[in-house]
Structure formats: structure tokens, C-alpha cells
């Protein structure tokens, strides 16, 4: 990236995060991660906003105390943290004065619809999902404050940036067609090269588009919808299933804190959907026997089948104490898949 990336970070912090002079702002990202640099430091400072930096471990009560003590008005955090706050219970929120909160945003991975509904219930306002990548250097598609939110959508491209859904040859696709989320190059914060890997850098571009590696679709109103990483999409019984939609359906069940979904090779169906699920603490305490666990698995499979297409439910479910994640909170499906298939795990940092 070049130094002019701060232009995009400044503008999007103003437009999307709605930062104002009088705000007290908290971006919960690690300062060493790209979001920490772009929006905990550069985006907030360039807008003249006071920012909280907290280096401690995640603790729901501690987080609410910080929001209360420092009168935080704009809060930018990760879906994983939101789900953990949901799991901690709503009663904890009532112990603190959070009336100064006016704008909530999320970053790092897709935002499950259930998390948006929860924030409306407990904070009186939705979390606004934002989409971008290390390679893009700044927010590219988002739900900004002036927009009506379609729960589950990534939102729309930020002003000055052109986004589209394209096929593998870089040709634009129609409304509600699954394809690659792509951007027209040359926005200020776009990466300029990959160090010592020029061919890798070139591989990101096709027919005048930057190909993000994420799959999605665009509806008739211009809202973008995330399906999954291109290499995460599951092909089962001749159908394509994005892991995010299955994970979101599972998380909507009251017994589930979070879920990670992979495709597992199957001789009959090509792949089957396997889900790794973290259960609510109260459910774990009441579930001691194998028959009880099997009953919950069956209940979850039927729940997903009821809310999604008949082929999109998990045929295997495994309960976990926690899911492998990056420092930024993204669920590392590739590590879960490597463990499941007995393959080398590789780098566990990103």
C-alpha cells in the first residue's frame, strides 16, 4: 500500500463509521492488525476523534464497563465478539449506562443476521456490517448510517468505488447471480504489489477487475450479499452452498453460540456439510449423555433444513469447546477442514 491509503481510510471513517469531532470511538481490533492500523489509528486520528485503545483480554463485563466509563459513542468490533456478548446474556448490559452509543459497526468476517436482530433488541440500533480486505486497505462495501439495512447484507459500495459480481472471466453477471465480488482498481488504498511475488499480484486481476476471492451476489436494489470464500463454497449433491448461510442458520438457534461449516468429501454427494458447533453454557450443563447430544444434533439439523434449502443442512455435527480463529476473530475453516481430513494444518496466524 502507499501512503495515500489514508485518503480512503479518512473518507470511509467519516462516511461509514460516521466519526465526528465530539465522538468517543472504540475500534476493538488489535493495533497490529490491518483494521487496527486503518481505523483504530489512521481513520480516527485523521478525523480528529478521540479513540480508546484497550489491550486486555475479551471479557463481556469489562467491555461494557469500558463503553460506559469512556462514554463511547461509535463502536467498531468483530462478529465473533458480538456473538460472545450475546452468549453472556442481556442482563449484563442492564448494569451499565450505554445511552451514549449512537452508531455500531462490525468488521472482520460476515455478520450473522441474528447478531443484528440482537443489537436492535438490546442497544436499540443495528450493527452495520462492513466489507473489505487487507488487500483493499479500507472499507469498500458497507451499510452506512444513511441507508436502510437489509439484515444479512454487506451493503453497497462506498462513493467513488465501483463493485460488481463477475464470472471467472471477469464478465459482469445479472441480479441475484452468484459470482466473484470484484472491484474496479485504482482506489487510493488498493495494494500496489505483493513483495517479491509479482505474479501472485497479477493473479488478482481479470479483465480490468480486482477479483477479491469472495463469492456473493447483488440484488435488484444494489445491495451485495456474501456467500463465502471461493475456496470455502461447498458443492453437495450438485448444488453450491455457502458456509456462511449454514453458520447463520445454526447461530439463530438459541442453543448455539457459534458455528463453523466445511465441506467433507463424500462418494455419493461429492461433499457433505459438516458443522462444528459451540453450544450455550447452560445447554452444555444440561447435556451429559450421548443420547442427549444426539438429540441436539438432530434438532439442529432439522432447524437448518427448515430455514434453508433441503440440501443445505449439516449431515454431520461435532460439538467443540471453541473454534480456531485468526487474531482478528475470523473462523479458520481451512484449519478445521485440515484436521478433519488429516492434512497438514500450515500457518495458524491468518
Give each language-model segment a name:
Residues 7-27, 31-74, 88:
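Conserved AMP-binding/adenylation subdomain of ANL enzymes
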Residues 339-350:
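Acidic/polar alpha-helix N-cap and adjacent early helical turns
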Amino acid at each position: 500500500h502507499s501512503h495515500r491509503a489514508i485518503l480512503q481510510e479518512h473518507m470511509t471513517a467519516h462516511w461509514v463509521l460516521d466519526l465526528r469531532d465530539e465522538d468517543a470511538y472504540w475500534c476493538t481490533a488489535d493495533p497490529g492488525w490491518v483494521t487496527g492500523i486503518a481505523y483504530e489509528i489512521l481513520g480516527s486520528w485523521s478525523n480528529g476523534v478521540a479513540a480508546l485503545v484497550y489491550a486486555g483480554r475479551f471479557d463481556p463485563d469489562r467491555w461494557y464497563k469500558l463503553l460506559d466509563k469512556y462514554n463511547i459513542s461509535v463502536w467498531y468490533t468483530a462478529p465473533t465478539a458480538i456473538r460472545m456478548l450475546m452468549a453472556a446474556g442481556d442482563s449484563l448490559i442492564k448494569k451499565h449506562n450505554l445511552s451514549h452509543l449512537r452508531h455500531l459497526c462490525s468488521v472482520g468476517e460476515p455478520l450473522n443476521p441474528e447478531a443484528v436482530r440482537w443489537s436492535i433488541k438490546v442497544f436499540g440500533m443495528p450493527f452495520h456490517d462492513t466489507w473489505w480486505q487487507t488487500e483493499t486497505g479500507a472499507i469498500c462495501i458497507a451499510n452506512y448510517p444513511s441507508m436502510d439495512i437489509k439484515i444479512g447484507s454487506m451493503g453497497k459500495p462506498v462513493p467513488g468505488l465501483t463493485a460488481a459480481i463477475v464470472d471467472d472471466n471477469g464478465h459482469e453477471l445479472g441480479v441475484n447471480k452468484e459470482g466473484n465480488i470484484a472491484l474496479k482498481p485504482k482506489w487510493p488504498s488498493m495494494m500496489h504489489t505483493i513483495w517479491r511475488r509479482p505474479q501472485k499480484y497479477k493473479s488478482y486481476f481479470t479483465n480490468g477487475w480486482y477479483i477479491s476471492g469472495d463469492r456473493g451476489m447483488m440484488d435488484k436494489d444494489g445491495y451485495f450479499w456474501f456467500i463465502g470464500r471461493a475456496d470455502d463454497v461447498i458443492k453437495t449433491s450438485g448444488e453450491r452452498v455457502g458456509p456462511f448461510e449454514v453458520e447463520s442458520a445454526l447461530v439463530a438457534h438459541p442453543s448455539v453460540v457459534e458455528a463453523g461449516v466445511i465441506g467433507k468429501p463424500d462418494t455419493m454427494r461429492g461433499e457433505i456439510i459438516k458443522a462444528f458447533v459451540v453450544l450455550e453454557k447452560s445447554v452444555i450443563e444440561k447435556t451429559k449423555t450421548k443420547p442427549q447430544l444426539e438429540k441436539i444434533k438432530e434438532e439442529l439439523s432439522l432447524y437448518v433444513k427448515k430455514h434453508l434449502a433441503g440440501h443445505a443442512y449439516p449431515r454431520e455435527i461435532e460439538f467443540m469447546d471453541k473454534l480456531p480463529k485468526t487474531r482478528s476473530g475470523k473462523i479458520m475453516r481451512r484449519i478445521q477442514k485440515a484436521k478433519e481430513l488429516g492434512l497438514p494444518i500450515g500457518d495458524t496466524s491468518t
